[in-house]
UniProtKB/Swiss-Prot annotation:
Its EC number is 2.7.11.1. Pfam families: Pkinase, Ribonuc_2-5A. InterPro entries: IRE1/2-like (IPR045133), KEN_dom (IPR010513), KEN_sf (IPR038357), Kinase-like_dom_sf (IPR011009), Prot_kinase_dom (IPR000719). It is a single-pass membrane protein. Keywords: ATP-binding, Coiled coil, Glycoprotein, Kinase, Membrane, Nucleotide-binding, Serine/threonine-protein kinase, Transferase, Transmembrane, Transmembrane helix. It catalyses: L-seryl-[protein] + ATP = O-phospho-L-seryl-[protein] + ADP + H(+); L-threonyl-[protein] + ATP = O-phospho-L-threonyl-[protein] + ADP + H(+). ATP binds at L909, G910, R911, G912, S913, N914, G915, T916, L917, K932. Residues 731-802 form a coiled coil. The chain crosses the membrane at residues 149-169. This is Probable serine/threonine-protein kinase irlE. Its main location: membrane. It comes from Dictyostelium discoideum. It is found in: Membrane. The gene is irlE.
Length: 1350
């Protein structure tokens, strides 16, 4: 909007136009004010409307006052003259022309750096029209009282125009208006309502206010809509007249606070302070005091003004010897160092009082962080023997808290906050008096008082206990200047405004301590508050509680309080009795905390402490009643005894007897009510005598009463034993008992040593006897062998002699034949030779026949001798067998049925939970077995386990075998296959690598085949279990046993049946799930499926192939990394990427993504050479199939290449994260090189150039063309090489007879190994992508039997 020229010829038309313009401008102004999307441009329009309105009002008023001054009215009706630089007005007068700046817009004054009207006049004194506009605005400034206009100004106060407006018209704005208020009072309402953040213009505005306005005006600023106060706070605020500072406190504006506080401080100088007194009159709270100083500290805490508090209230530490570090360290170690002086320490304690009174967690946290190294911090490491209650520890904050209408959780969180920051509250007695001299006890000086009230809904302390997220910026605030005014003065900062000791001390003196801490905590009847307080003063259990902490009269207030429930009081008293061991301060174990006339509490305590479960460890009822007798009336005692009788007669025991019935009968009502029959010391009254001295209760019973009761009691109970315990021993008696105990201990040690020596000697003799028996047995065997050899020699000689005799006989008989029967009937024994030696030249006549009779007798005698020798040998065998049996009985001294074993520690193979043990033993006196002993009581599913073992035995060679079972009264004994050890034992003995590589030469292929055979056997065993619907659920190196160079699975399906026993060959049984071989669903106790075993097998495969490593790190961090799916396969990925790929699938976090075991066996890791070749051929056919042209393998590789960290390789980034680190770090989620399978490009650079040239230029006299940047051509190159390796070998040998490539072309297997070494990730890359696409996986190219890989 620019200036409008009005062409009016008559006076009447002129005035009519004036009024129309005025109304039009008013309408525009109202329209702009109602616009919600108010902007800077709208603000300028509004100001222009105002100036136009003022201008027309000026014209209107002047014409009404002086009708004859038309020359002033007709300034806008100028007709320019054509002559030179002059023009004539309507009356013909000649005026000099103004230049271009003379026509300046009224609003332009707000764009220039002209802070005052005088500056403006000095700049534009040559331009009459512009100056007149400004003067008319000043004269008509009363229009600024329009509220809707100031709503606009307050909304956009941060623009430079608004600040300039105040600078120019400040005098008129702050001058009183017709109603007595200045325009500023009206503006302040909107200003304080809109302003929140502390900006440069906000501070300039305050400077204008503080420089021009009077204090009464300031006090009326920003009263409404700032904050709600309680009735008491309203009175204090009103009295001290500090409305003006509430805004900066409300929004924690530091510099704004400094400006306002300095002005108010200067206007209200400090005077001597007096105590504030609040009294109630006619239902209203009033204040009576003569103090006039400001009290800001409560409101600093009320609004959590952390930045203001830290900058202006916290004292500055005074460091001693800041330049000499060594001397300062000596001061610290000697305890003489102090970061604060005594005045500062007291001030800090007072700040504790301020912030806790208003429940200000942020301010409290600020103080705690600021002073924790200098005050209130206890060195817990060096003071572990401190008793809170003895001499006060160093650097402990002495506090007394008063809880009014407490909010339980806030009080608890307050104590927890101090505890988390190592601030120990000490509410102790400075000088420890005697216990019974309670009247002279003086408590420590109260340094702070805490008051918690529900009336103020401040922030909770709980959010600041563990992690305090309060940002305190103590630096000077750097605000960017929006405008271009370089002449603004810097705001003067005033520091340490609130550090005046008089102000703070006066606030502290306002409220006197109401009570000590323990009574008020007990009055709250909150067990949680009490626990939080005890946790604080004990430093989380590092300190012991002094018995003097809980005074008897404080506890008496608790049990006398009629408000809390009986159950609550009972729980609190039990807690006190537990932590402070109050029984040490009483006689015969009777805690004095229960001396009360509230018998319903007494009986409740007795019921809770003397139930059937703890009756044997509790104080006997007689002691409770005896302690209560002096302090209760007769009627109360009758009721107590009645309730005690009811308690112990309520439920009979299983055998029909009632425990303590006869004991309670002793306490007849008349007997207990006769107090004079007890020789107890006299007390001075209930209040002073409640602090009992243990010696005061030592008394005797009248002998007549005792005799009469013994006669009356038929069972003749020994009352002395019931009423009295053994008195404390004297020092001499204690010393004597100690010497006797030492002597007995020495004798016992000597006896144990003798027994050990005797055991060693017995064992030595036994070994010596066994050695002698072995030597004797060897001698007998040698003698028997010699005898057998001798018999054979004799037999041979006899046969030779018999043939010679027969030949001679035939010669004598002239060739007559000899019948075979005659030869068969002859006795072939050694004695015949002797007889024939005695008879020379035998003849077949009668005489010789007669001499044959004695020969037969000799033969019979010889047969008898041979039988005797045989019997002797049999007897020796029997004796030897008997000796072996005796030796077995000596070695295995425990016999259960057919099992024999020894329970010595050296004979234990393993331990399990619930008392399960595995022993080495024998079955049927000859077969070595592993004997598993299981407790019947703790293993209810033993029969189920045996049933499964029997059903699975001999059906799979990779499962542990069942042999037999026996049982006795308590245990069941299973005979299982005895193995050589477990994978874990091999690893512990550093023999795992030796076991895997045994029976192999240096060929890596043989070693790999050995490893794969072991893994396949283990997987087949688990597959067999799954086929039987059994989930093992506990596969780990301790349950994988070694037998005959095979891996055998033990603990078959016990976790599936919830049997907690284990079969481990380890001396340390680890609970299920704690060794890191269980997936996350087992750790979270979710449903268990077969995928649990897949996860465990993946970890075991990694264990075997890396010589004992684990995918999830060491045993201390495995569980945490399993739940976060953080694994590290780097130890294997450098050796075998194919195995890494398989393991990564098997240990997937999501159980649905883990492969089945049948799919695991189809993984390329277990492929032979034929299957790999078939796979490459099928892949080549697939990539050339027209139906799968849309599957561009090279496009996939290029996409992977863009995600790879290297620009010269193509990667399969199935998982985006990869790392070469060998350890699992918190920053990396998954570490595995298998997450990126790379094929170098161009691929011909990875091969020997002789091979590439040979295959490219001459294959069966045909030239083959290959694209070295295409993976399809690489597969074709490999296929052609494998098919024509013989021809390529012959061609290269003729050209390069000494080339190294010839070794790789001797066979198809060697050629395949060559390509696998050059491209180790090729097959797994193709397998991974093909298996993810159903159309390819189910295509005809992979459906035949030779290549059914998916």
């Amino acid at each position: 909007m620019g200036k409008k020229k009005i062409d009016i010829n008559t006076r009447e038309d002129l005035f009519l136009s004036y009024y129309k313009e005025i109304e039009k401008n008013k309408f525009d102004l109202l329209k702009i004010c109602s616009d919600k999307n108010f902007s800077k441009s709208n603000f300028l329009k509004a100001v222009h409307c105002l100036f136009s309105l003022s201008y027309f009002c000026k014209i209107k008023d002047e014409n009404e006052e002086e009708e004859g001054k038309e020359e002033e009215i007709n300034d806008y009706k100028v007709k320019k003259s054509t002559t030179g630089n002059y023009y004539r007005n309507s009356e013909g007068k000649l005026f000099k022309k103004s230049n271009e700046k003379d026509q300046i817009d009224d609003v332009s004054i707000f764009y220039k750096r002209l802070p005052t009207i005088q500056d403006f006049k000095d700049t534009y004194d040559k331009y009459e029209n512009c100056l007149n506009s400004v003067y008319y605005i000043i004269r008509k400034i009363k229009l600024l009282h329009l509220e809707y206009f100031w709503e606009i100004l307050a909304s956009c106060y941060g623009t430079i125009s608004f600040i300039k407006f105040f600078n120019i018209f400040s005098n008129e704005i702050f001058s009183p208006s017709e109603n007595g208020d200045s325009v500023f009072i009206m503006v302040g309402k909107f200003f304080r309502r809109k302003v929140r953040a502390e900006t440069h213009y906000d501070l300039i505005f305050l400077k204008i206010i503080l420089a021009n306005a009077s204090i009464p005006m300031i006090l009326k600023l920003g009263v409404k809509d700032i904050g709600r106060f309680t009735e008491k706070e309203d009175i204090i605020v009103s009295y001290y007249r500090n409305f003006s500072i509430i805004h900066s406190l409300r929004f924690d504006n530091v510099k704004e606070f400094a400006l306002v506080y300095k002005t108010l401080k200067n206007n209200y100088p400090s005077k001597k302070k007096k105590k504030i007194t609040l009294f109630e009159e006619n239902g209203k709270i009033n204040v009576k005091t003569s103090k006039k100083d400001l009290m800001l500290f409560e409101f600093v805490c009320k609004f959590d003004c952390v930045k203001i508090f830290k900058k202006y209230f916290l004292p500055k530490p005074q460091i001693i010897n800041n330049n000499d570090n060594n001397e300062m360290l000596e001061c610290i170690s000697s305890g003489s160092y102090s970061g604060f002086d005594e005045k500062s320490k007291r001030k800090i304690r007072i700040f504790f009082s301020i912030c806790c009174r208003q429940i200000s967690p942020k301010i409290l946290k600020c103080i705690v962080d600021y002073v924790k190294d200098d005050i209130g911090f206890l060195d817990l490491q060096n003071r572990q023997d401190i008793y809170i209650g003895d001499s006060a520890p160093e650097k402990v904050l002495f506090l007394n808290c008063f809880f009014g209408n407490h909010k339980e959780q806030r009080v608890i969180d307050f104590f927890n906050l101090l505890t988390s920051k190592s601030i120990i509250i000490c509410n102790t007695i400075k000088e420890k008096p005697e216990l019974y001299d309670y009247r002279y006890i003086t408590l420590s000086t109260v340094d702070s008082t805490f008051y918690f009230s529900d009336s103020h809904k401040g922030a909770d302390f709980g959010v600041y206990t563990d992690e305090i997220n309060v940002i305190i910026n103590n630096d000077d605030i750097d605000y960017d200047y929006i405008g271009d005014d370089d002449n603004d003065e810097e705001i003067e900062e005033t520091k340490d405004y609130g550090s005046s000791s008089s102000d703070i001390d006066d606030f502290y003196n306002v409220f006197e301590p109401k009570a000590s801490m323990i009574p008020n905590i007990l009055d709250s009847c909150s067990l949680e508050i009490l626990k939080a307080y005890i946790q604080n003063i004990t430093g989380n259990g590092l300190f012991k509680i002094s018995p003097s902490l809980f005074l008897a009269h404080d506890v008496t207030r608790l049990v006398r309080n009629p408000k809390p429930k009986t159950e609550t009081v009972v729980k609190i008293l039990e807690f006190i009795n537990t932590i402070s061991r109050l029984s040490e301060l009483s006689t015969n174990g009777v805690p004095f905390t229960f001396l009360t006339n509230r018998f319903e509490i007494v009986t409740s305590i007795i019921m809770s402490l003397h139930d059937e479960r703890s009756i044997s460890n509790s104080v006997e009822p007689v002691q409770w009643l005896r302690a209560l007798a002096p302090f209760v009336s007769n009627d109360e005692m009758k009721l107590i005894i009645y309730k005690v009788r009811t308690l112990y007669n309520y439920e009979p025991h299983s055998n029909g007897e009632i425990k303590y019935t006869e004991l309670v009968r002793l306490f007849d009502v008349q007997y207990l009510l006769t107090k004079g029959k007890f020789s107890l010391s006299q007390f001075n009254g209930f209040e002073t005598s409640i602090f009992l001295n243990p010696k005061l209760l030592d008394g005797t019973i009248n002998s007549n009463i005792l005799n009469s009761m013994i006669i009356k009691d038929k069972e003749k109970l020994d009352l002395k034993e019931l009423f009295f315990k053994e008195k404390p021993l004297s020092e001499a008696e204690l010393k004597e008992k100690f010497e006797i105990a030492t002597k007995n201990e020495k004798e016992l040690l000597d006896q144990l040593k003798k027994e050990n020596d005797a055991e060693k000697l017995k064992k030595k003799n036994k070994l010596k006897k066994q050695k002698n028996q072995q030597q004797q047995q060897q001698a007998k065997q040698q003698a028997q062998q010699q005898k057998q050899q001798h018999q054979q020699n004799i037999q041979q000689n006899y046969e030779n002699q018999h043939i010679e005799d027969q030949r001679k006989f035939n010669q004598q008989t002239k060739g007559r034949p000899i019948s075979p029967s005659s030869i068969q009937n002859q006795n072939l024994n050694p004695t015949l030779l002797q007889n024939q030696n005695q008879t020379s030249n035998p003849t077949p006549n009668l005489e010789s026949t007669k001499k044959a009779t004695p020969t037969t007798t000799t033969t019979t005698t010889t047969n008898s001798n041979t039988s005797a020798i045989i019997n002797e040998i049999k007897n020796q065998d029997l004796n030897q067998q008997q000796n072996i049996t005796e030796n077995i009985n000596e070695i295995y001294d425990v016999s259960i049925g057919k099992f024999k074993f020894n329970k010595k520690e050296s004979n234990i193979l393993g331990r399990g939970s619930n008392g399960t043990l595995v022993f080495k033993g024998i079955w049927n006196n000859r077969i070595p077995v592993a004997i598993k002993q299981m407790q019947k009581m703790f293993n209810p599913l033993i029969s189920k386990e045996i049933e499964i073992l029997i059903g699975l035995t001999n059906k799979n060679l990779n499962l542990v075998g069942y042999i037999d079972q026996e049982e006795d009264e308590n245990c069941v004994y299973l005979g299982l296959t005895l193995c050589d050890g477990s994978l874990q034992s091999l690893y512990d003995q550093s023999k795992l690598n030796e076991f895997i590589n045994q029976n192999n030469n240096q060929n890596n292929n043989n070693n790999n085949n050995r490893v794969l055979d072991l893994i396949i056997g283990m997987i087949n065993g688990v597959i067999f279990l799954h086929d039987q619907n059994i989930v093992h659920n506990d596969l780990n190196p301790r349950n994988i046993l070694v037998k005959d160079n095979r891996l055998i699975i033990s603990d078959l399906g016990l976790s599936k049946m919830n049997v907690s026993s284990t079969y481990n060959f380890s001396t340390n049984a680890i609970p299920t799930g704690q060794d890191g071989y269980h997936p996350v669903e087992v750790l979270l106790e979710k449903r268990k499926t077969k995928s649990v075993d897949v996860f465990s097998l993946g970890c075991l495969i990694y264990f075997i192939m890396t010589n004992g490593a684990h995918p999830f790190g060491d045993k201390f961090s495995r569980l945490r990394y399993i739940t976060k799916s953080k694994y590290n396969l780097s130890q294997l990925s450098n050796l075998n990427l194919v195995a890494t790929h398989l393991i990564e699938l098997m240990i997937s976090y999501d159980e649905s993504k883990r492969p089945t075991l049948s799919s695991v066996l189809k993984h390329p890791l277990f492929w032979d050479s034929l299957k790999k070749i078939k796979f490459l051929e099928s892949s080549l056919r697939l990539l050339g199939d027209h139906d799968f042209k849309k599957f561009n393998i090279n496009k996939i590789l290029i996409s992977c290449n863009s995600n790879s960290s290297s620009s010269n390789s193509i990667c399969n980034s199935s998982n985006s994260s990869s790392s070469s680190s060998s350890s699992i770090s918190s920053s990396s989620c998954k570490i595995s090189s298998s997450s990126c399978y790379c094929v170098p490009l161009p691929w011909n650079q990875s091969l020997d150039y002789q091979l590439v040239d040979s295959l490219s230029n001459q294959i069966e006299k045909k030239v083959a063309s290959y694209k070295f940047d295409q993976l399809h051509d690489l597969i074709r190159f490999i296929r052609n090489t494998l098919q024509h390796y013989n021809q390529i070998y012959r061609d290269l040998k003729q050209i390069l007879p000494n080339s190294d490539i010839l070794e790789s072309l001797k066979s198809q297997q060697s050629a395949l190994n060559y390509f696998e070494s050059k491209f180790p990730t090729l097959i797994i890359f193709l397998f991974n992508h093909f298996s993810a696409i159903p159309e390819i996986k189910n295509s005809i190219h992979f459906s035949n039997d030779t290549c059914s890989i998916f």
